[in-house]
């Protein structure tokens, strides 16, 4: 086991951000932590990478290992070129091969904009550079905290294809957070979290088979008119006051 957490918890000002989290990460695996905004995903990443101290629980690594992290917000300098940013970061590590920056520039397709200022790049280009920066020290685990946030669908797909290929070719251990199930499709293990707790886990296929449902939850101030419209057309149930769960039989309507 490369990484394991036991009963990991984090409390901020009496608010439980992460609650009794148990993860098991195998060497060379692709693990996705999936959940909505505020579920505790970023807090978990920050604890796993040593940026936050847990309130309780343990984080166990198999021997000292090197970590690479792609944060939601970039840590690179907008006023430096891509090449300059990467060379400065490379200089902060010991024993990095002199050709490492050039190798990553080629591997991640940064050649066409390596001399541009980082601040002038598109969102997708910045993400590629951010990933290159995280790979400078040849990490044993690459952490990606919602790396496609704010990107359009085509750019999202390109970034995830890049990450997937890196994971396969380099046999890299990858841990990512996302709120898109499709981005976790290639994961060996998915942990679905909500309010800081794991509520489901398994492969993408198992998660979809066991938990995916075709329904729409609707919140309204008064359900009377909506129920009148729906009763002849679409099955529904009233789960709480002013809250309906609609079960469409098809997505074509």
Regions found by a protein language model. Name each.
Residues 87, 98-113:
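Conserved ABC ATPase "signature" region
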Residues 117-121:
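Conserved ABC ATPase signature
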Residues 138:
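Conserved catalytic motifs of ABC-family nucleotide-binding domains
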Residues 142-145:
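Catalytic Walker B motif of ABC-type/P-loop ATPase nucleotide-binding domains
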Residues 162-245:
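ABC transporter nucleotide-binding domain
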């Amino acid at each position: 086991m490369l990484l394991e957490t036991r009963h990991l918890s984090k409390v901020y000002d009496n608010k439980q951000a992460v609650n009794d989290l148990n993860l098991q990460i195998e060497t060379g695996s692709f693990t996705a932590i999936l959940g909505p905004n505020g579920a505790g995903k970023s807090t978990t990443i920050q604890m796993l990478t040593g940026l936050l101290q847990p309130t309780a629980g343990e984080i166990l690594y198999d021997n000292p290992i090197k970590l690479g992290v792609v944060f939601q917000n970039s840590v690179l300098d907008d006023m430096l070129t891509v090449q300059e940013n990467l060379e400065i970061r490379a200089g902060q590590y010991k024993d990095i091969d002199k050709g490492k920056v050039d190798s990553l520039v080629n591997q991640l397709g940064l050649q066409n904009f390596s001399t541009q200022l980082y601040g002038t790049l598109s969102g997708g280009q910045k993400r590629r550079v951010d990933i290159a920066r995280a790979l400078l020290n040849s990490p044993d685990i690459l952490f990606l905290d919602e790396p496609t946030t704010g990107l359009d669908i085509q750019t999202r797909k390109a970034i995830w294809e890049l990450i997937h290929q890196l994971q396969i070719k380099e046999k890299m251990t990858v841990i990512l957070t996302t709120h898109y199930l499709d981005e976790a499709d290639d994961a060996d293990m998915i942990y679905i979290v909500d309010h800081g707790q794991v509520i489901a886990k398994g492969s993408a296929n198992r998660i979809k088979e066991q938990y995916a449902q075709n329904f729409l939850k609707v919140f309204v101030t008064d359900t009377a008119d909506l129920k009148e419209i729906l009763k002849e057309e679409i099955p529904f149930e009233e789960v709480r006051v002013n809250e309906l769960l609609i079960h469409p039989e098809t997505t074509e309507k």
